[in-house]
């Protein structure tokens, strides 16, 4: 498996479902996926785990400003991982290649200052910011369906904010 292009340092996640990219589905999981997708797929659509190359995402709606390039990604992999959560409909839409609203950018800040810079830029430029924790949302909370109220969307991945600090 070739190394994907990402600003994330975590093990490569499956962009289309639960788990890591180097893990294979069991026979039972394969059957479950086929059953899930067949409910929503028209005309017995062939079921196969999607590949990054299967997707043609629209370009980001705004150009990434220089001030954010150190920690904000526009790679296809990062945008796919952050397009949906891991609910049944999310996984089925990935298998059917239905990515209607991928985030324009994906931020991986490592400092509070970077979060502040991102939020200030987003506020000033009418960009929706969508928090992303571990990527296990099953209620649509990470989806970038922002309508026409915003110019663009950024998924704010909190991967590097994994410590609880208590100030006494």
PLM ranges: what are they?
Residues 1-166:
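Noncatalytic alpha-helical scaffold of FAD-dependent oxidoreductases
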